[in-house]
Amino acid sequence: QGHCARAGAGVCGAAIAAKKEGVDVLLVDKGVLESSGNIGGGNDHFMAVLNEAEHDTFEDMRKYYVTPTSGITDTIAYNFYKAMRPCLKVLEESGIELLRNPDGTYVRSAGFGQPGPWWIHINKGYTVKSKIAKYIKNLGIRVVNNFFVTKLLKDGDRIAGCVGFDVLKGDFVTVRCKTAVIAFGLSAQRVSTNSTRKPFNCWYSPYVTGSQIILPLEAGAAVLNLDIADKGTL
């Protein structure tokens, strides 16, 4: 059995891929699948390098992302590149409308100083997460909402589950698994990346608590570059 913690876009992708390989998947989140994660607020664009236009190749992407200070390697960039078309397939299978030109190609724009038109436009992007949630449930992936993970459980050197509580009922919950994918968020939005100190005035999800750092650390994982990456919390 596989266990995917937090139901943002990243772990939804992991859950879908695992399920399609025949794994029994349980997905848990402290919120609700239909609205959790950064994507829960909607999104009107998706980045994909498709070899269909000028400056639209992996080499263009590699030159942009793999720099001495980015922390991104050739392998990381290539794995990202390989996942783009499969992700597009899932999005369209979910019923998400990616805008197209009359010739059938995607409507795309350049952005963020990137050399090519890598950003595909999405119609009614506020529906993205709810449609992905429906797609996940139709695959038969089990979902536990409102479950806040407080500690990872170990069996030797591997993660064997987690414990936490239902944020609405207060019930204590234990999950056991053979393999875990943990994607609790990128930063700690309540403190480090919000200069106004207003908790909901931020770009990404305001509900990222820093547990993506402390829970693996408590379980014995190494944490690198926390002092320079602005991902910490008080």
Predicted region positions:
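N-terminal Rossmann-like FAD-binding beta1-loop-alpha1 element of flavoenzymes
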Residues: 2-27
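Short hydrophobic core segments
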Residues: 3-5, 174-185
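Generic hydrophobic/aromatic pocket-lining and core-packing "Φ" positions
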Residues: 14-15, 88, 213
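Rossmann-fold NAD(P)-dependent oxidoreductase module
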Residues: 17, 135, 215
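Short beta-strand "acidic-cap" motif of Rossmann-like dinucleotide-binding folds
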Residues: 24-29, 223-225
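Conserved N-terminal/central alpha/beta ligand/cofactor-binding core
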Residues: 30-151, 155-160, 164-166, 171, ...
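Glycine-rich loop(s) and the adjacent beta-strand/alpha-helix scaffold that form part
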Residues: 182-234
